[in-house]
UniProtKB/Swiss-Prot annotation:
Keywords: ATP-binding, Cell projection, Cytoplasm, Cytoskeleton, Kinase, Nucleotide-binding, Transferase. Pfam families: ADK. This is Adenylate kinase 8. Residues 391-424 are annotated as: LID 2. ATP 2 binds at residues 278-283, 392. It is an enzyme of class 2 (transferase). It comes from the Eukaryota. CDD domains: ADK, DD_AK8.
């Protein structure tokens, strides 16, 4: 870049490359690791960190009172995410660790081990290859604020913390029916989760310390400690109610651990709204443009502007409009390229609607480098679309727009003179809907990370869903 040439304009490909390859997050993670470990020679340390390629592996802590189901949820998450499960019991059973041997003796005597020894065990275990490569889930650790602070001091930072919660009366009752499979460690319940196989039923054992009094004492100790542990994990902690079916708890936990936290990475929204005619794309685009100062790029409007301005492309487009034919994709993309290449689109971002209508247009859009970083499908039932569009009317005298159901004219005189736009005729709408439905499956497959929104609700509710999808990072895809 020539220092004498001002102002500098950064090519749009540069921030797009950084965003697609998560360059900012990569640099942020390396800086965090440098500050935590403070190596004497940073360069080899950073190279080693890059070789590990484990910035996005699961690092999860699951906490909760006795009988909340945290071990079950942790085991299910481990199977789904292919991560390593760390519990107090399996940490002390590590046969290849002298620290674990010492901790095991203390654990057999007292059923607890000192915090310093526990944290040392965790540190040793997390350094092993399976935890480094595949990530880890801590079940029920840390139990106290002292343990939480010791873990943080060593630079062990979870990405997600889940706290299960349920009324004490429910937990006490649930704990009485708890049973354990001694071979697999799986936890069952006499009422809620009884195994169908008679072989497993016969070998189930009643765990120790599950009486009502003992459970109440454990709950009292848990409540005393958890209020001091929670402040150690601001912004990464989610409380989930355990007073619901275990499968529901699991899916809420899985959804949370697959989410990404917001970062300070530069982000220029490039939003694509897809959906059938009448799904509300234009309204949502206008709301986004108004609130976030995005450039509202409507494909149909661009074509009309090109004709009105009598540009070269406008003259080529005009015959298609006169004959009511679809504009050639090549012409369409040239008009669109001119608009998206302007500085306001590059600097502020854009919200595009009206294109692509099919897979060919989508591939053309991508080949030109206009890759959206947020794609939304607005789903609206066929009957709702017909109701929205076929009942629209316009007053030829005042130009006022009406809807026979949602915004009827105030007088019979006005009603009598209302006209319907030919494009809102039932047959025309059905043709457009049929075309949209035929192409939607291909577009959904192409835009795999797209977010589907129910468009058949209040427009501002729809806007809130779209807004949330733009502001928050996209969830991780677990293979």
């Amino acid at each position: 870049m020539d220092s004498a040439s001002v102002p500098h304009r950064i090519p749009p490909e540069m921030p797009q490359y950084g965003e697609e390859n998560h360059i900012f997050e990569l640099m942020q993670n390396m800086l965090e690791q440098l500050l935590i470990h403070q190596p004497e020679d940073p360069i080899p340390f950073m190279i080693q960190h890059l070789h590990k390629d484990n910035d996005n592996v699961p690092r999860i802590v699951i906490l909760g009172p006795p009988a909340s189901g945290k071990t079950t949820i942790a085991m299910w998450l481990c199977k789904h995410l292919n991560s390593s499960l760390l519990t107090l019991e399996n940490l002390v059973l590590n046969e290849f660790s002298l620290t674990a041997t010492k901790a095991k003796r203390l654990y057999l005597q007292r059923k607890t081990i000192p915090s310093a020894l526990l944290v040392q065990l965790i540190q040793e275990r997390l350094a092993e290859e399976d935890c480094v490569k595949r990530g880890w889930i801590l079940d029920g650790i840390p139990e106290t604020r002292e343990q939480a602070l010791r873990i943080q001091t060593l630079g062990i930072t979870p990405r997600h913390v889940i706290v299960l919660s349920a009324p004490d009366t429910v937990l006490i009752e649930r704990n009485l029916g708890k049973r354990i499979d001694p071979q697999t460690g799986e936890i069952y319940h006499t009422t809620f989760d009884w195994p169908p196989e008679s072989e497993i039923q016969n070998r189930l054992m009643v765990p120790e310390d599950i009486s009502e009094l003992e459970t109440a004492q454990k709950l009292l100790e848990y409540h005393r400690n958890i209020v001091r542990v929670i402040p150690s994990y601001p912004k990464i902690l989610k409380v989930i109610s355990a007073d619901q079916p275990c499968v529901d708890v699991f899916y809420q936990a899985l959804t949370y651990v697959q989410s990404n936290h917001r970062t300070n990475a530069p982000f220029t929204p490039r939003v694509l709204l897809l959906g059938p005619v009448g799904s509300g794309k234009s309204l949502q685009a206008a709301l986004l443009a108004q609130k976030y100062r995005l450039v509202n790029v409507c494909c149909g409007q661009l074509l009309k502007e090109a004709m009105a301005d009598r540009t070269t492309f406008g003259e080529l487009i005009q015959p298609f409009f006169e004959k009511e034919m679809a504009v050639l994709d090549s012409l369409l993309m040239k008009v669109l390229s001119q608009r998206l290449d302007q500085q306001d689109c590059i600097q502020k971002g854009w919200v595009l609607h009206g294109v692509p209508r099919d897979l060919d247009q989508a591939h053309l859009l991508n080949s030109l480098g206009y890759n959206p970083n947020r794609v939304f499908f607005l789903n609206v039932p066929f009957d709702s679309i017909m109701e929205r569009l076929t009942l629209r009317r316009i007053d030829p005298v005042t130009g006022e727009r009406y809807h026979l159901m949602y915004k009827p004219p105030p007088t019979m005189e006005i009603l009598a003179r209302l006209l319907q736009n030919p494009k809102d005729a039932e047959e025309q709408v059905k043709l457009k809907m049929d075309l949209s439905y035929r192409n939607s499956a291909d577009l959904e497959q192409l835009y795999g990370s797209a977010i589907t929104v129910n468009g058949d609700q209040d427009p501002y509710t729809v806007f809130e869903y779209i807004e949330s999808g733009i502001i928050n990072p996209l969830p991780k895809k677990i293979p």
